[in-house]
Amino acid sequence: MTRDKKYYICSNCANISNKWSGQCFDCGVWGSIVEEIINTNKSIIKGSKQTFDKLSCNVSEQLRIPTPICELNRVLGGGLVLGSAILIGGEPGIGKSTLLLQLTASNFESEMRCLYITGEESLDQIKLRAIRLNITNYNTAILAATNLEDIIASIDDNNNNIDLVVIDSIQTITTKELSSPPGTVSQIRTCANELVNYSKQNNIIILLSCHVTKDGQIAGPKILEHLVDTVLYFEGDHNNHFRILRSYKNRFGGVGEIGVFEMSNSGIIEVTNHSELFLIKREHNVVGTSIFAGIEGSRPLLMEVQALIVPSNMVTPRRSAVGWDANRLSMILAVLSSRIGLNLANYEIYLSIAGGLKIADPASDLAVAASLISAATSIPLPEHSVFFGEISLSGEIRKTAKAETRIKEAVKLGFNKVICSKLENLTYDFIFPCAHLQELKEIIK
């Protein structure tokens, strides 16, 4: 007789305990313990011998298949790899399903046989969305199913005719082996594990769409990200028309690469002039505004940094940062006060990265400092200038990685003044190297 036992599993770290608690004892997260029913009547099956292979470099490049979406190829490291499992997460309505449907209906250079499986929509709804997106490739197979065994059986029935499988989404898939509802930790873990193993054994590419939590993390157990080969996040603000696809894990390419897309009525469109998308053309510079020459992955990207400083009557003036680390803003303010005498203790300070972008590059310190100095002194920054450089606690400006790539992107977009840390082997007339914040202050004056 089958024996089912209740366990309590942390939805954050998948730690299993015998009783419920408000906080996970393993990872410390509150409110993450959920009840699961696990079948304990499983017999141990003896394994069989496997054949060893040797590590060699004669793998065919045909294993990587470029997609018709160039921005997606950049993020993936050149294209889709046969037998790989890819997880793509994002907020509801951000465009995950639209991107995946456009991908499956694209015309690949090498003939790709694609299957789009939905657990959230009916077949008629998928067809209506395809009409809205002007998709004319009607050879794409679609299937509405939520049962794992049915999905694998359907793929097996057409195994020789399927190269790419999209499942939208993994939270809706369930297996008959478990009695727990869809979206629970055990269901997600078991179904994802079976699908990943199936893709490896049959050399099929599987793309899994995934929900995210209110904190922007992949919904479900953390092991889900460990199972797959690639983890992508589709980022963006519903109030803005652009979207960014970013890689957080990639066994076949670089991590941190981004692809820039634009959301339109006819679907998702690639953006090639990505830097121009986030910049506003002005005849004269505005007080408190600077341009940061950044790097996202291997891609140079120019971004606008805006600062606003106003007097405050509060005991503790407000410090707000949108798209930038608030703790790092406090550090830059302390360095400006200590090293160049710019005391802003009685002022409210607002910092924003234009376009809803988020910057984690330490080289953005110099652009932020320039915007703050400009806003505090009401002096516009030099026209057609860009900034990059990391600021230390001593006020020194440290060297920055990929400086030449940043400079080339700035020059290409018409900027003729680069204010940055001191560089080696780069001595152009338009480069103004700074060793300390005091030199930056003199340039702004």
Swiss-Prot record:
Gene Ontology MF, one: damaged DNA binding
- Enzyme Commission numbers on file: 3.6.4.-
Q: Keyword DNA damage: yes or no?
A: yes
Sorted UniProt keywords: ATP-binding, DNA damage, DNA repair, DNA-binding, Hydrolase, Metal-binding, Nucleotide-binding, Stress response, Zinc, Zinc-finger
Short name of one Pfam family for this protein?
A: ATPase
Lipoprotein as a keyword of this entry, yes or no, is no
Protein name (database record):
DNA repair protein RadA
UniProt source species: Rickettsia prowazekii (strain Madrid E)
**Gene this chain is encoded by:** radA
